[in-house]
C-alpha cells in the first residue's frame, strides 16, 4: 500500500548476495505502481563482492536497466574508493579514519577504459530522454557537463528504473 503512495524507492542489495527472492516480489509491485527506483549496493568490502555482477543480476532477474553511476576502486578488502561516472573523477577514502575523509583524484589508469565505457553507457541511457544531450554525445562526448548528466538522469529516472551506486 505504501508503495502506491511513494514518490520513489531505494533498493539496497548486498554486494555478495545480489538480488534476493523478496527483491523480485517488491520489484514487481514497484513496477505495477510505476515507482521510480534507485539502487544501492553495500558491503563492497566483503569477500566475494561484485558490484557490476549485482547490476547484471538486476538486469537479468528484474528486467531493469540498472545503470551504474559509480565504479569501484578495488575489490573486497582492497575496496578503497569509487569512480564517479557523472563527475568523471575518482574518490579515494582514507583508511586511518574509516573513510570519513577522502581525496578527489584522477581516475586510476587501470580503470580509465572501463570508466569511459560505463560513462558512455550511462550517458546513452539517460540521453534517450534528452535529445540535446544525445546530439552532444555523438558530436563531442567530452564536452558533456556534470549538470547535463544530472538533469538527464533526473528526467530519465522513472524510465531507467535504477541508477545504482555502492558503499562498504
Residue spans of the language-model regions?
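P-loop NTPase switch module centered on the Walker A-proximal segment
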Residues: 5, 9-13, 17-20, 68, ...
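Conserved Switch II/interswitch segment of TRAFAC-class P-loop GTPases
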Residues: 9-24, 31, 35-52
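Canonical P-loop GTPase G-domain recognition
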Residues: 47-103, 161
